[in-house]
């Protein structure tokens, strides 16, 4: 076979994969906001508070679910998926995360809302099917919220962790890149880790349109805008390595296990994002990174059962990295 024939065949494969993704991804990428799992919500009686935190940047109060790890405790920010709801954070809807982390010495913080936001400061108003609002989520998470928690709840404003799923996995890493003193730990579960590359911007735009009717251009401008590169974890590896950020990176392969998640959307999407995670690991190692856990299991779909299992497995690592004192809180 000639070199030209090989190139044509390779281009054809890319076009087929791209077309399939473009047709399928809009309804899939936000699956993280779907129906609750059988293990949804923590048991009653836990000291979970529902805070209304003022945000000058967004011009409204933001609901935050909070469980204290004790005075002076480090914080774990659990970030939601693309279809984040306005009533509860997806981690609470779909897992007993508060129960898992009760008396762990870690304050658990779940911001509520932010559908399709990527937890970013958007260029323009976020206009969707429900109307327009201001999205300045990075400002909220890195300035307004930590100041409020330090002043009112005794939570450390530095040495924290950000853990995200799907949409917010890349957000967790970018928060650590941009705010290394606040976020010394970033957990990314089943995220697309090269969003600026290839068809990434187009597919993200389609998915955001499906999840609330939002436009990616309002977030970071056209795909040629440098904001896309600034928010691409695969291009920010030198900063993550240089800051010695502790990373926990997970992605399944689209094959369900006994945990569940056996449905076509969850299987397709997990398999779709896996390659970006494998490439990220290779680039991280090549850059001299040595402070990461990579879990690329021989099973796992794009669903809460697997993300919950990872959050459970992550707890001792979080406690060690953040210097938490077990038994704190409650």
Curated annotation (Swiss-Prot):
Taxonomic lineage of the native organism: Bacteria, Bacillati, Actinomycetota, Actinomycetes, Mycobacteriales
Top-level taxon in the UniProt lineage: Bacteria
Region named Fibronectin-binding: 98-108
GO terms for MF: diacylglycerol O-acyltransferase activity; trehalose O-mycolyltransferase activity
Reported function: The antigen 85 proteins (FbpA, FbpB, FbpC) are responsible for the high affinity of mycobacteria for fibronectin, a large adhesive glycoprotein, which facilitates the attachment of M.tuberculosis to murine alveolar macrophages (AMs). They also help to maintain the integrity of the cell wall by catalyzing the transfer of mycolic acids to cell wall arabinogalactan and through the synthesis of alpha,alpha-trehalose dimycolate (TDM, cord factor).
Swiss-Prot/TrEMBL catalytic activity: 2 alpha,alpha'-trehalose 6-mycolate = alpha,alpha'-trehalose 6,6'-bismycolate + alpha,alpha-trehalose; an acyl-CoA + a 1,2-diacyl-sn-glycerol = a triacyl-sn-glycerol + CoA
EC number: 2.3.1.122, 2.3.1.20
Binding site for substrate: 82-83, 166, 194, 272-275, 279, 302-304
Main location: secreted
Keyword Nuclease attached: no
Secretion signal, residue range per the UniProt entry: 1-40
GN (gene name): fbpB
Location of this chain's protein in the cell: Secreted
Catalytic residues (UniProt): 166, 270, 302
Keywords per UniProt: Acyltransferase, Disulfide bond, Secreted, Signal, Transferase
Any one Gene Ontology cellular component term annotated for this protein: extracellular region
Assigned protein family: Belongs to the mycobacterial A85 antigen family.
Pfam families listed in its UniProt record: Esterase (PF00756)
Name used for this protein in its record: Diacylglycerol acyltransferase/mycolyltransferase Ag85B
Cysteines joined through disulfide linkages: 127-132
């Amino acid at each position: 076979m000639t070199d030209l024939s090989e190139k044509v065949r390779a281009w054809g494969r890319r076009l087929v994969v791209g077309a399939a993704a473009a047709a399928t991804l809009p309804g899939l990428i936000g699956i993280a906001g779907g129906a609750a799992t059988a293990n949804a919500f923590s048991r009653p009686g836990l000291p979970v508070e529902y805070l209304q935190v003022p945000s000058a940047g967004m011009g409204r109060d933001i609901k935050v679910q909070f469980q204290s790890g004790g005075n002076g405790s480090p914080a774990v920010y659990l970030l939601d998926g693309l279809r984040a709801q306005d009533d509860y954070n997806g981690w609470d809807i779909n897992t007993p995360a508060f129960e898992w982390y009760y008396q762990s010495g870690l304050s658990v913080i779940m911001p509520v809302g932010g559908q399709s936001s990527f937890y970013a400061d958007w260029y323009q108003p976020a206009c969707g099917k429900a109307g327009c609002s201001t999205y300045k989520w990075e400002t909220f998470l890195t300035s307004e919220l930590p100041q409020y928690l330090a002043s009112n709840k005794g939570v450390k404003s530095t040495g924290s962790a950000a853990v995200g799923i799907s949409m917010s996995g890349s957000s967790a890493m970018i928060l650590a890149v941009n705010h290394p003193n606040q976020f010394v730990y970033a957990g990314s579960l089943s995220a697309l880790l090269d969003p600026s590359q290839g068809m990434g911007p187009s597919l993200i735009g389609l998915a955001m349109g499906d999840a609330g009717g939002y436009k990616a251009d309002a977030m970071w401008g056209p795909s040629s805008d440098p904001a896309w590169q600034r928010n691409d974890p695969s291009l920010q590896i030198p900063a993550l390595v240089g800051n010695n950020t502790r990373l926990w990176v997970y992605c399944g392969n689209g094959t369900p296990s006994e945990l569940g998640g056996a449905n076509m959307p969850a299987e397709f999407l997990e398999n779709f994002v896996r390659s970006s995670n494998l490439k990220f690991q290779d680039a991280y190692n090549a850059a001299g990174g040595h402070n990461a856990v990579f879990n690329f299991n021989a099973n796992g779909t794009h669903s809460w059962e697997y993300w919950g299992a990872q959050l459970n497995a992550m707890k001792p690592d979080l406690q060690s990295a953040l210097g938490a004192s077990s038994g704190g809180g409650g």
